[in-house]
UniProtKB/Swiss-Prot annotation:
This is Large ribosomal subunit protein uL29. It comes from Psychrobacter sp. (strain PRwf-1). It holds the Pfam family Ribosomal_L29. The keyword Manganese does not apply. One of its GO terms (cellular component) is ribosome.
Length: 64
């Protein structure tokens, strides 16, 4: 999802999306640990998405 699309969402929607991404991150870590993860680039992309969502939540809460 693009950052411009994320900026249009409310804090509640972003929080829900953050929960989903964190669950995905857990699943990716488990797949990596068991050797079932074929595409390792997904781990980095997921971490980046989580960071972007957290940044936007923080910006919206601070009123920036």
């Amino acid at each position: 999802m693009k950052i411009s699309e994320l900026r249009d969402k409310s804090v509640e929607e972003l929080t829900g999306l953050l929960d989903e991404k964190q669950l995905d991150a857990f699943r990716l870590r488990m797949a990596k640990a068991t050797g079932q993860l074929g595409s390792t680039h997904e781990v980095r992309a997921n971490r980046r998405a989580i960071a972007q969502i957290k940044t936007l939540i923080n910006e919206k809460q601070r009123g920036a």
